Amino acid sequence: MPIIKVRENEPFDVALRRFKRSCEKAGILADVRAREFYEKPTTARKRAKAAAVKRLAKKLSRENARRVRLY
C-alpha cells in the first residue's frame, strides 16, 4: 500500500498527484482491474501466451527495421 506524507504547506492537489503516481508505480489499479472478474486458469494462460507472442513479434519487427536502416 503506497503511503505518502503530506508536507507542510503542500496543496492537496499536489499530494493527491503524488499518491496517484505512487499507486500507479505499485500497480494497484492494474491489479484491481485484473481481479475485477474471475478469469479461468486456461483463459489466463491463453492471454499470457498471446502477450508473449505479441512481444516476440514486436521485438523481431524492431530488429528487422534496424537492419533495414543500416546500410
Curated annotation (Swiss-Prot):
The keyword Calcium does not apply. It comes from the Bacteria. Keywords: Ribonucleoprotein, Ribosomal protein. InterPro entries: Ribosomal_bS21 (IPR001911), Ribosomal_bS21_CS (IPR018278), Ribosomal_bS21_sf (IPR038380). GO terms for molecular function: structural constituent of ribosome. GO terms for cellular component: ribonucleoprotein complex; ribosome. GO terms for biological process: translation. HAMAP family: Ribosomal_bS21. Belongs to the bacterial ribosomal protein bS21 family. This is Small ribosomal subunit protein bS21. It comes from Shewanella baltica (strain OS155 / ATCC BAA-1091).
